[in-house]
A protein has these predicted regions:
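Positively charged n-region of N-terminal signal peptides that target proteins for export
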Residues: 1-7
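Generic N-terminal simple sequence motifs
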Residues: 1, 13, 22-23
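Pepsin/retropepsin-fold aspartyl endopeptidases
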Residues: 21-321
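Bacterial N-terminal signal peptides
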Residues: 7-18
């Protein structure tokens, strides 16, 4: 999760979706086929150590990798990577703050072309800041974060488990969102409304042991997180495992592993849920719904339609660390 107050807009996008027949026939069984019929373009995602989903992109003709981060309000390019591709960086008075509380200055720039899969974003305004901390773990180098602002504008759908990102070249479409809702709920998914909070984070209502709590849908968070006061007030029990939790924009936060008897996400119930807890420095008491539970429960994040879809595994052992 990051707070990032720059006011940005994306100019345009061009997609070349897979050509398919629209002749009458049985409804598609796969989400990929369904979204292609709806006109979406797609980009495969990869997962690196640390549980980060990322996309290989071409930015201004250079191959780069961006983390897919619904917890980032806006798209952010690392300052070193921005220099490497010759971006013109404009200094601002804006700052970004991560869950650890560390604040970094954020400047602004514009990307002429950002190609992701068979879609090309044109004239993309981005923030520029030091995100070197995200590369503290081993694995492919990440050059920044693809954030919620661009996802919302172009109706992005993220399939967390199958590691795909889809873009609607016509922007967010109520008709496409409704068709997607019917497709997924007809296949056993629970639909959970999302909203933007005051800091432009995607948020859902959840319950921890029956206690209401707001949770930010954060594909950039490796694990699900609760602020310690919220966790303890909800009856969380710590396991005795302590560690230091890092953030994409730097800093470290003392954290613990805890369990709660029940985590309710819409109609989906996770029993004996394992969580990370710590003294969050931002977010007004909101937790983070991280990538492990999103992928484990076949999470589909429809940013254009402002809905999260989850379906529990048919049979799975308790999540083990």
């Amino acid at each position: 999760m990051r707070t990032f107050p720059l006011g940005l807009a994306v100019a345009a996008i061009v997609c070349f979706p897979t050509l398919i027949s629209h002749a009458a026939g049985p409804p598609p069984a796969a989400l990929k086929t369904f979204l292609e019929r709806e006109g979406f373009g797609g980009s495969p995602l990869q997962r690196r150590f640390g549980n980060h989903l990322f996309a290989t992109t071409i930015i201004n003709g250079r191959r780069m990798a961006l983390a897919i981060d619904t917890g980032a309000p806006f798209t952010l390019v690392d300052s070193a990577s921005a220099r490497g591709i010759g971006l013109r960086v404009q200094q601002t008075k804006a700052h970004i703050t991560g869950v650890t509380g560390l604040t970094e200055r954020a400047d602004a720039a514009s990307i002429a072309t950002l190609r992701m899969g068979n879609c090309t974003f044109l004239n993309v305004p981005v923030g520029v800041a030091d995100t070197a901390e995200i590369n503290a773990v081993r694995g492919p180098h990440l050059d920044g974060l693809f954030g919620a602002h661009e996802m919302s504008k172009f109706g992005v759908v993220i399939d967390c488990a199958r590691q795909m990102l889809y873009v609607n070249p016509h922007g967010a479409s109520p008709a496409a969102n409704q068709n997607l809702a019917q497709f997924l709920t007809g296949r056993g998914f629970s639909r959970i409304p999302m909203r933007f909070d005051a800091s432009h984070h995607l948020e859902i209502e959840a319950k921890v042991n029956g206690h209401p709590v707001a949770m930010i849908v954060d594909t950039g968070a490796a694990t699900t997180f609760l602020p310690a006061p919220v966790a303890y007030n909800s009856g969380a029990a710590t396991s005795g495992v302590n560690f230091m939790m890092g953030g994409a924009t730097g800093g470290a936060l003392p954290a613990k592993i805890a369990r709660v008897q029940e985590l309710a996400l819409g109609n989906l119930l996770v029993h004996d849920a394992e969580l990370t807890i710590g003294e969050s420095k931002v977010g007004g008491g909101a937790g983070l719904l991280g990538e492990e539970y999103l992928s484990w429960n076949f999470g589909i994040v429809d940013v254009g339609g402002m809905n999260l879809y989850l379906r529990p595994p048919e049979s799975a052992p308790r999540k083990n660390r």
